[in-house]
């Protein structure tokens, strides 16, 4: 097959017709160098202070200027102990960042310190996932750079000590995989192993996102047990997906049952998707590509917002929305979409996170989609948004992403800098800082920002194919990692770049992103105006365009989804729903329209010219007037003498009983029935009266002795939800008899000239409403049900 560059990556020569009105503030080569060096300076401010105040502890406390290690006094403090294993966390995590910065002397010195100071014989219980991605990944990446001459960082007299340490750590982690399912325990004590009666809950991401590191260890040592354990865990999680292809968030490692059956792309599940696609790149195994493709298909259908600016959390069994927020971890997803060639989706999603970033100055841990406010406060120096910005720039070379990176650097330096490091934000609204600088800030956030502004970095050279792990560690993609794969499909590198980008041909002062017609609309979704957007990121002549549909709502009758093949069937432009139970219905509203539109039915997407028919005979059990209901109120009136017909609207008739089949004689009344008539009414007569100023219910009550009431209207609004209990009364629970009542438009007043009339319910398809709002493309097929 062709290379990954041609199959998946959008490695672009931009097909742009630049206009004068596309100008966004320019970043020239000198400014690029300046921003690159700013990234370098910020890194060393954090790194040097860690080495001065915190080494050999795991983390630097940036406010108190001291080192931080495990919380030995409180072993249950998993927020700390999951990552701090008393194993030089920050130093190991940043080793290959020194390579990216071109610091050969610093890299050699750091490797020497790791070799002489690290010790895994520690009585600390760490998270298997964190130890793998931060420590194991850091050791493996650094071993490769230290041992291979071609990368320019080979260390004289280096004897593979980092690989030995990596192997020792992996051996200490392997007992966690000894479960009936092959899914590892979340935590393990480095000295004592898995604790007796250890918690059996693990999240999908932590259980499955170990493939890259363990496969690299197998490639370097030749011992297949590492790769086999990680692969078994990955596919053990995958095979427990729901019937609609969605994973849950947390799982019981002993039984394999989902504990928290909620799906999304954020915390608890994020890196599963990342490692599905990256494992395909790294190993060339088509099984991982299949997992990615099926996952993305289900995510787009069940979790994506209508216009795919963000992905929501839904119940994995039925796709119903569970929460109304997105978290900062999910900001990695645009970058992953870039790698998979879904560039347009990546741009849209990145714009949404960028708008949130502008609103608060950083990405909050959780952002509420509907209140447009912070749901979970804080910013712990996470790298995901910087990572996606980097990938999008490498794929598009659009100056917009350089400006985004410039903003990130500026906010870091101006708001997060402390005399001895950089501090996480505890409260974004008050911008109070917390005394913590997690290792990923140096190993990922500043690494991606440095690479964003360093086009000429050796990492970007075409003959060096690297893949970033979920912790930002660099693994070279070589034949060695794919030797055990029977079918090699992958032939190219992971980082998607426009390799022959010619600055003289494509000046950097142009941006296609700032000129997008949905640029302002995304800001509107988040609730910010142009005043919050830097002027150099605004196209003054840009065109604003609103999407055709706004996000709507979903309905699901029953607790789980049924197979869409059994209950939803398409015949050309008609879609038939034979069973409403188990089919999620998504309704949206067109911009500027007073009606709703059924957008999806089960797994079927509804097109503009489609008509949807419900053929479920039990529909009345699940519909009601104050929610989804079908207006079976078309009345067919007929002159039995001439055969002339016309149609009106039933305001009242008993669905449980057949309409009277007899012929009524007609009587025309000059006055409305808002007042009780003085004469006795006849049950064999149809009374025709003008619609009065009182409610139709009151008029029908006043005509309760009649056989039929026909109200003539000039087009006044009649509330279809008004019913016989609408009048305030102590006796509203008693249902009085009122005759069948029909509303007839004035142009059909010729009925009053008929001597007799018969009436029945029409066989026309019944239109649908949701809480009184019409649904333009959904009908109840009465003929289908009656037959």
Curated annotation (Swiss-Prot):
One of its GO terms (cellular component) is cytosol. InterPro entries: 6hp_glycosidase-like_sf, EDEM1/2/3, Glyco_hydro_47, Seven-hairpin_glycosidases. GO terms for molecular function: calcium ion binding; carbohydrate binding. Glycans are attached at residues 479, 609, 670, 693, 756. Keywords: Endoplasmic reticulum, Glycoprotein, Signal, Unfolded protein response. Belongs to the glycosyl hydrolase 47 family. Alpha-mannosidase-like protein involved in endoplasmic reticulum-associated degradation (ERAD). Delivers misfolded glycoproteins to proteasomes. It lacks mannosidase activity. This is ER degradation-enhancing alpha-mannosidase-like protein 1. It comes from Schizosaccharomyces pombe (strain 972 / ATCC 24843) (Fission yeast). The lineage of its organism: Eukaryota, Fungi, Dikarya, Ascomycota, Taphrinomycotina.
């Amino acid at each position: 097959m062709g290379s990954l560059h041609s199959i998946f990556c959008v490695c672009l020569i931009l097909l742009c017709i630049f206009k004068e009105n596309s100008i966004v503030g320019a970043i020239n080569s000198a400014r690029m160098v300046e921003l690159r060096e700013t990234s370098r300076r910020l890194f060393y401010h954090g790194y040097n202070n860690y080495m001065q105040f915190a080494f050999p502890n795991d983390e630097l406390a940036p406010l108190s200027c001291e080192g931080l290690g495990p919380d030995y006094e409180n072993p249950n403090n998993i927020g700390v102990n999951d990552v701090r294993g008393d194993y030089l966390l920050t130093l190991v995590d940043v080793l290959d960042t020194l390579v990216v910065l071109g610091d050969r002397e610093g890299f050699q010195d750091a490797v020497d310190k790791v070799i002489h100071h690290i010790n895994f014989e520690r009585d600390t219980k760490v998270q298997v996932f964190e130890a793998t991605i931060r420590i194991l990944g850091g050791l493996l990446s650094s071993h490769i750079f230290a041992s291979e001459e071609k990368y320019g960082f080979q260390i004289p007299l280096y004897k593979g000590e980092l690989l030995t340490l990596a192997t020792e750590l992996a051996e200490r982690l392997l007992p966690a995989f000894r479960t009936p399912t092959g899914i590892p325990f979340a935590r393990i004590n480095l000295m004592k192993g898995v604790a007796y009666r250890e918690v059996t809950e693990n999240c999908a991401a932590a259980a499955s996102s170990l493939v890259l590191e363990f496969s690299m260890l197998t490639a370097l040592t030749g011992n297949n047990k590492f790769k086999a354990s990680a692969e078994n865990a990955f596919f053990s999680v995958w095979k427990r997906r729901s019937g609609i292809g969605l994973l849950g968030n947390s799982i019981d490692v002993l039984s394999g049952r989902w504990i928290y059956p909620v799906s999304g792309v954020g915390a608890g599940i994020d890196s599963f998707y990342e490692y599905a696609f990256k494992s395909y790149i790294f190993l060339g195994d088509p099984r991982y590509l299949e997992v990615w493709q099926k996952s993305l298909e289900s995510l787009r259908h069940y979790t994506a917002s209508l216009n795919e600016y963000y992905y929501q959390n839904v119940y994995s069994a039925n796709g119903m929305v569970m929460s109304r927020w997105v978290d900062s971890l999910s900001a990695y997803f645009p970058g992953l979409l870039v790698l998979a060639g879904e560039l347009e989706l990546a741009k849209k999603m990145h714009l949404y996170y960028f708008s949130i970033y502008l609103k608060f100055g950083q990405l909050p841990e959780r952002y509420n989609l509907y209140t447009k406010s912070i749901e979970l406060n804080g910013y712990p120096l996470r790298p995901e948004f910087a990572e996606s910005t980097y990938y999008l720039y490498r794929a598009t070379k659009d100056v917009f992403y350089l400006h985004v990176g410039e903003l990130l650097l500026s906010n870091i330096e101006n708001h997060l800098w402390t005399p001895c490091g950089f501090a996480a934000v505890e409260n974004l609204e008050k911008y109070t800082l917390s005394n913590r600088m997690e290792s990923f800030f140096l190993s990922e956030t500043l690494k991606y920002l440095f690479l964003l502004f360093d086009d000429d970095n050796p990492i970007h050279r075409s003959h060096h194919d690297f893949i970033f792990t979920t912790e930002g560690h660099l693994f070279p993609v070589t034949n060695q990692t794919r030797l055990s794969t029977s079918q090699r499909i992958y032939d190219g590198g992971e980082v998607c770049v426009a390799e022959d980008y010619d600055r003289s041909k494509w000046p950097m002062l142009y941006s296609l992103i700032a000129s997008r017609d949905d640029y302002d609309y995304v800001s509107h979704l988040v609730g910010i105006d142009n005043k919050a957007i830097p002027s150099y990121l605004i196209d003054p002549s840009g065109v604003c365009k609103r999407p055709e549909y706004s996000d709507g709502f979903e309905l699901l009758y029953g607790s789980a989804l049924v197979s869409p093949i059994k209950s939803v069937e398409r015949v050309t432009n008609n879609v038939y729903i034979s069973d409403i139970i188990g089919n999620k219905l998504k309704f949206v509203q067109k911009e500027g329209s007073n009606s709703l539109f059924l957008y999806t039915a089960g797994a079927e997407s509804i097109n503009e010219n489609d008509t949807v028919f419900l053929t479920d005979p039990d529909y009345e059990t699940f519909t009601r007037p104050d929610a989804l209901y079908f207006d079976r109120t078309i009345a067919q009136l007929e002159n039995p003498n001439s055969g002339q017909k016309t149609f009106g609207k039933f305001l009242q008739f008993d669905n449980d009983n057949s309409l009277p089949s007899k012929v009524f004689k007609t009587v025309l009344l000059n006055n409305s029935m808002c007042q009780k008539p003085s004469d006795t009414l006849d049950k064999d007569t149809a009374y025709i009266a003008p619609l009065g100023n009182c409610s139709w219910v009151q008029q029908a009550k006043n005509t309760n002795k009649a056989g039929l009431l026909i109200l003539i209207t000039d087009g006044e609004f009649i509330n279809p939800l008004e019913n016989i209990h609408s009048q305030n009364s102590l006796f509203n629970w008693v249902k009085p008899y009122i005759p069948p009542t029909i509303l007839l438009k004035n142009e059909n007043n010729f009925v009053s000239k008929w001597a007799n009339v018969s009436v029945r319910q029409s066989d026309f398809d019944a239109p649908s409403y949701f809480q009184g709002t019409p649904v333009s493309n959904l009908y109840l097929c009465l003929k289908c049900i009656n037959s």
